[in-house]
Amino acid sequence: MGSNFIVALVMLLNASRADVQLRPFHEDPTLSGRAQQRAEFLCNARRFDHDGMMAAFEGSPYRWKGENIAKGHRDAKAVHVQLMNSPGHRANILKPQFDSVGIGQACDITVELFGGR
């Protein structure tokens, strides 16, 4: 996985936003680190839920906060298609208030953390 996966996923996210005339996400290194920690936690705990999501934003400057989680894919395009086909996840990707993203991946779990000021 690693950086190629994340670069590809950010490109897909930004392409989807461009399709509806939204500005692209800025990749936030702090959110990325927290998304990676969250993905590792979910993987190691064998969980797949949004419980505890707000802890990932503790101390962050973001007014708007959101999380997408996907499971079962290790390919960026497959993850993106899965999330775009889910109304709630799609809403996060296309939420105008979000301007920053961080992505983490562990096992077959992908975490996208979104922030907006």
Regions found by a protein language model. Give the residues of each.
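Surface-exposed patches in mature extracellular/periplasmic domains of secreted proteins
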Residues: D19-G33, R46-A56, R90-Q105
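A short alpha-helix/helix-coil micro-patch that ends at or immediately precedes a cysteine
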Residues: G2-N44, G59
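Disulfide-stabilized extracellular recognition modules
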Residues: A15, K71-R117
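Short, surface-exposed glycine/acidic/tryptophan-bearing loops
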Residues: S32-V79, I93
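Soluble non-cytosolic domains of exported or imported proteins
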Residues: S3-A8, F25-G33, D51, A70-A78, ...
